[in-house]
Amino acid sequence: MTLQLTNEWDKVFEKSDKVNHKKVSFKNHFGIEIAADLYIPKERNDKLPAIAITGPYGAVKEQSSGLYAQTLAERGFLALAFDPSFTGESGGGTRYMTSPDLNVEDFQAAIDYLSNLDEADSNKLAIIGICGWGGMALQTACLETRIKAVISSTMYDMTRIAGNGYFDADNNKGARKNARKAINNQRTEDYKNGEYKLAGGVVDPVPDDAPEFLQDYHAYYKTPRGYHKRSLNSNGGWTIQTNGSLANTRILTYANEIDMPVLIIHGEKAHSRYNSETAFDMITGETKTNGVTPEPYTGVYPLGNTKVGNKELYIVEGASHVDLYDNLDKIPFRKIETFLKTNFEV
């Protein structure tokens, strides 16, 4: 199937006059065509260090990942923001499905593409995952040997959230069995109806007593600030039954074997902070979190940078989860740039 790619600028952020932009596509090894935006600095002399970026989970490349890509291109990198399989402008017959194996493959397919791109230095490749894709970026780093560095920003471990609930509140056999029953009953209904029911995107209108992080999601996905017509979170959301794949799989089994430089970024005030701090423990062999996730979670690591070997955790003072989607005063691009250039030896 030929992708129908939009040529006009339809991002939720302004176009930079320092960067050239073009639409591209490539296939993953499942044969799904992936749509992407390629951002290249206008002023360049040689092959460039290159970064593949995607996320947040349920967003599209016209939102946060595109902003990251364009901003990093302004700082001298070639950056590729892509729509994962079954979402946005990318292919895939069943829309709005996800699975950890497929998520990792999309990242690896992006590396396939960049490894063969004339403008890119194939010896200086990295990946960045935002929100739920932060966890998938770390999972990719467990397998991918062609990249020199990996960054997660405002990370979720979607398999943990799907299997245990927020703050691990449903981390018990009974709760998981009830969730499995609901998902499998939905599969029966979907087959009977001939279509996959969607879970719904961000709640609109958001109740006054909703948790602050839900209000933050609404402020991004449901207002002109971040709304996009192809974004799952801005509209109908994922299919309900796709949660089964997430809940039945656990990423980061081999996190302690990641031997490349890692930068995990999270906001001090983010409800999701425990995902990053636990992941940092897993890849460094630390035990500070001890798997405990009280609500609200206030964190066990200090503000700023914590470095253990070649792994770094960077807690952004005062930042919420959604601040790291598009708040240029909170996203630590200088830290990201320095981390990448140091590890690319630029």
Language-model regions, residue ranges each:
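Catalytic histidine-centered segment of alpha/beta-hydrolase-like enzymes
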Residues: A319-D329
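Alpha/beta-hydrolase-fold enzymes
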Residues: L138-T223
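Short beta-strand element of the alpha/beta-hydrolase
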Residues: K47-P56
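The serine-hydrolase catalytic nucleophile loop
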Residues: G58-Q70, P84
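Alpha/beta-hydrolase active-site loop
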Residues: M97-D118
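Conserved alpha/beta-hydrolase
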Residues: T71-G91
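Short beta-strand/loop motif that positions the catalytic acidic residue
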Residues: I258, I264-H266
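N-terminal cap/lid segment of alpha/beta-hydrolase-fold proteins
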Residues: L3-D46
